[in-house]
């Protein structure tokens, strides 16, 4: 009788683990990156290089606990300080290469190429 109890418990545990694994495999990652989005995390822009078509709006999202800014080196755009989970958007209308950096942490750099 005790042996049947342990067998049943083992089968239920294995079944639960397999169900959980199957469900987890089908779920998107919690931090899945949106198209045309640059994530600011660990004092880096990710991706560090992004190519978009003219007319595209790019969104930067700060996932760090520290504030960051999004600055174009040619002065075309400059965000306010973004706290954690804040976003900044800019629509690129002209083709070209746009160098971006954080005004607070200038070693953080990225490039947006607009076609």
Where are these regions (language model features)?
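Extracytoplasmic copper-binding redox domains, predominantly the cupredoxin/blue-copper superfamily
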Residues: 2-16, 20-115
């Amino acid at each position: 009788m005790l042996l049947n109890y342990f067998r049943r418990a083992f089968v239920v545990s294995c079944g639960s683990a397999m169900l959980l694994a199957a469900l987890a495999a089908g779920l998107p990652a919690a931090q899945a990156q949106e198209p045309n989005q640059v994530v600011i995390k660990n004092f880096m822009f990710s991706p560090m290089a992004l190519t978009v078509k003219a007319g595209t709006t790019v969104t930067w999202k700060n996932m760090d606990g520290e504030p960051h800014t999004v600055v174009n080196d040619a002065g075309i755009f400059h965000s306010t300080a973004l706290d954690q989970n804040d976003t900044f958007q800019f629509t690129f209308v002209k083709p070209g290469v746009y160098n971006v950096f954080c005004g607070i942490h200038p070693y953080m750099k990225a490039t947006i190429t607009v076609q």
